[in-house]
Swiss-Prot record:
Required for cytoplasm to vacuole transport (Cvt), autophagy, nucleophagy, and mitophagy, as a part of the autophagy-specific VPS34 PI3-kinase complex I. This complex is essential to recruit the ATG8-phosphatidylinositol conjugate and the ATG12-ATG5 conjugate to the pre-autophagosomal structure. Also involved in endosome-to-Golgi retrograde transport as part of the VPS34 PI3-kinase complex II. Belongs to the beclin family. It is found in: Endosome membrane; Vacuole membrane; Preautophagosomal structure membrane. It comes from Candida glabrata (strain ATCC 2001 / BCRC 20586 / JCM 3761 / NBRC 0622 / NRRL Y-65 / CBS 138). This is Vacuolar protein sorting-associated protein 30. Component of the autophagy-specific VPS34 PI3-kinase complex I composed of VPS15, VPS30, VPS34, ATG14 and ATG38; and of the VPS34 PI3-kinase complex II composed of VPS15, VPS30, VPS34 and VPS38. Keywords: Endosome, Membrane, Vacuole.
């Protein structure tokens, strides 16, 4: 085959997957018998006569000539047709193609075509490309219009898929055919059985009797069914009524439960509110008791000690060589002491004769009225870094005079307390004789507290006695020198007396 013919086989596409394909060269060299197989024949349609096709095909096959006669016939047929011309072909090949075409075996026909290609030789290669394409188009058109219901050409892969599908259809058709055979045999057997008249009449009689029994049984069952249906209707009505009653009962129970739950919820909320309010009330009472027990003076002026130092509000009052304390801290402590004495005198309305306190923090002062000058003189109650001749000559300074004035003020306040105690004690003794038992129950605690506070000053007065510029025999004057251990001890005694005054003042104020 030349290149022109070979290229002509590439212009076709698979009608299934639409991919270009190459037509097998054997399609250009078909025999007459092969071409006849491609033509549709009415006698090959499915039907009852299909079973006789095999015998008719065998008869036609026997009429086929062999040898030179068959070759001559084939050559004449090919020369008179519009298809391709083939050389002499062996009769056995045509016979085999015809048999395999009648049996519809595509696999055998493919192997036959492969063997035939090796023996064929094209006689006429002068045909044009259009003629070859036209012939192949006619060939595919004939194949497509046949009873196969397949559009040609198709590729090898699509052909394999269709062969599997046709094989499945074939198996289904065989099963259907077998089913028809069985049905036909059954009908034939039934016809043979009914041919016996005696048996038929007996069967008819039995059928009649059986029919009567069936009718009677049917009537009985219908009557029984009617009764059952009536009972069922009654039961359905009773069930519906009971269901309605149950639904109403459940609805009432839900409503009642809802109301009870609401009441319980309100009760729980009320109890929680009561508990919360009671807890808040108790908490506030505890706070009130704590506030009542709290002494504002003790909280404001905390007097304590740290080793050899006395402290007021955490400030050390004193200093010596081994433990130096800054002047600013000492001045602040003296300012707190002045503020404490002024607070006690103003709270109990005690008038200090000849002195006026000026609490100004770390620069507090005290003023003293001088009778000979008939004027007030102010003394500093803080250490100053200013230069003064008194410090050089170790003379009495304003600070020393102020400290002496501070001792005199403490002594006056203690004497005022003693006067108040003596007057209150006389009054309490007279009241004690005239009060009734009920008044004793109401005010006994206050009187006992008052008496205890009175005894504090009637029995021992101040813990450390004050005499001029000395407290417990120790002078509070420095004469311009640095603070020492002796002066620090004197300050400790002074703060101790001040704390006693503070306790007495707190007791009096709590009773009021």
């Amino acid at each position: 085959m030349n290149d022109l013919q070979f290229d002509s086989l590439k212009v076709f596409k698979c009608q299934n997957c639409h991919l270009p394909l190459q037509v097998d060269p054997t399609m250009l060299h078909l025999s007459k018998s092969q071409r006849e197989l491609l033509l549709p024949r009415e006698d090959r349609r499915p039907g009852v006569e299909e079973f006789n096709l095999r015998q008719e095909s065998q008869d036609m096959l026997k009429k086929v000539k062999t040898g030179k006669e068959a070759k001559q016939l084939l050559k004449e047929d090919f020369q008179s047709s519009d298809f391709l011309f083939l050389r002499d072909i062996d009769d056995s090949i045509a016979e085999k193609d015809l048999k395999k075409g009648l049996e519809g075996d595509n696999d055998d026909r493919k192997s036959n075509e492969d063997s035939m290609v090796s023996e064929l030789d094209v006689e006429d290669t002068a045909k044009t490309l259009s003629t070859q394409i036209e012939r192949l188009s006619k060939l595919f058109e004939i194949m497509s219009t046949s009873e196969s219901n397949i559009d040609y050409p198709i590729c090898q892969e699509c052909c394999n898929i269709m062969m599997k599908r046709l094989k499945t259809d074939y198996e289904k058709a065989v099963k259907e055919r077998d089913l028809y055979f069985q049905f036909v045999k059954r009908i034939e057997k039934q016809q043979l059985d009914e041919s016996d008249s005696s048996q038929l009449s007996l069967r008819q009689k039995e059928y009649t009797d059986q029919t009567k029994k069936i009718n009677q049984e049917r009537e009985r069952l219908l009557l029984e069914l009617t009764k059952k249906e009536q009972v069922e209707e009654e039961l359905d009505a009773e069930i519906a009524e009971l269901t309605r009653q149950i639904s109403e009962k459940k609805a009432n129970e839900r409503a009642t439960r809802k109301i009870d739950n609401a009441k319980q919820w309100d009760k729980m909320k009320l109890l929680n509110d009561i508990s919360s309010l009671q807890y808040q009330y108790e908490t506030e009472l505890n706070k009130l008791d704590q506030l009542r027990k709290t002494n504002i003076y003790n909280e404001s002026f905390r007097i304590s000690h740290q080793g050899p130092f006395a402290t007021i509000c955490g400030l050390k009052l004193g200093s010596y060589e081994d433990h130096k304390v800054s002047y600013s801290e000492i001045n602040a402590a003296l300012g707190q002491l002045v503020l404490l004495l002024m607070t006690i005198s103003s709270s109990l309305n005690i008038k200090i004769s000849g002195y006026r306190l000026q609490p100004i923090g770390s620069t507090s002062k005290v003023s003293k009225f001088l009778a000979d000058k008939e004027d007030w003189e102010t003394y500093e109650l803080y250490f100053s870094s200013n230069f003064s001749l008194e410090k050089i000559f170790k003379r009495e300074t304003d600070f020393d005079k102020g400290m002496e004035s501070l001792l005199d003020i403490v002594k006056q306040i203690s004497l005022s307390f003693s006067t108040v105690v003596s007057s209150d004690t006389d009054i309490n003794i007279q009241d004690e004789r005239t009060r009734s038992n009920d008044s004793m129950l109401n005010g006994g605690a206050n009187r006992n507290a008052n008496l205890r506070a009175d005894r504090l000053f009637t029995e021992s007065e101040l813990p450390y006695m004050i005499d001029g510029d000395r407290i417990n025999g120790i002078s509070v004057k420095l004469y311009g020198a640095e603070p020492n251990l002796e002066w620090t001890t004197a300050m400790k005694f002074l703060l101790t007396d001040a704390k006693w005054l503070l306790v007495f003042c707190s007791s009096k104020l709590s009773l009021q």
